[in-house]
UniProtKB/Swiss-Prot annotation:
It comes from Chloroherpeton thalassium (strain ATCC 35110 / GB-78). One of its GO terms (cellular component) is cytoplasm. The gene is acpS. Its cofactor is Mg(2+). This is Holo-[acyl-carrier-protein] synthase. InterPro entries: 4-PPantetheinyl_Trfase_dom, 4-PPantetheinyl_Trfase_dom_sf, ACPS, Ppantetheine-prot_Trfase_dom.
């Protein structure tokens, strides 16, 4: 089992967006994630928690975001009930999305993500 955790101040995400606008979002999110976040009442919290989740996933993998693992290759989408799920848009180390468990949370100030990667059965 591998575990990764990340926390970020939502104000950092907001400042980056104010400086770079949609270019910032396009760098760290997929189009589906951008659409979902921008339709939320507090979009910066949604963006920040996805940023934290991608960072936590990279930490759990022990690779960081670079090379094969890019911001765009990881996608966090919510199902009809609102449960977030991590999808890999391209194969990475033989990992299946079903092996990845997420716990995401945020306040008005911080977003936090915990990622657990279970061994393949």
């Amino acid at each position: 089992m591998q575990v990764g955790i990340d926390i970020i101040e939502i104000s950092r995400i907001k400042r980056a967006y104010e400086r770079y606008n949609r270019l910032f979002l396009k760098r760290i999110l997929t189009e589906s994630e951008i659409e979902w976040c921008l339709n939320k009442p507090r979009p910066f919290e949604s963006v920040a928690v996805r940023f934290a989740c991608k960072e936590a996933f990279a930490k759990a993998m022990g690779t960081g975001i670079s090379g094969e693992l890019s911001w765009q290759s990881i996608e966090i989408l919510n199902d009809k009930e609102g449960k977030p799920t991590l999808f890999l848009k391209q194969p990475f180390n033989g990992l299946k999305s079903e092996q990845v468990k997420l716990s995401l949370s945020h306040t008005h100030e911080y977003a936090v993500a915990v990622v657990i990667i279970e061994p393949d059965k």
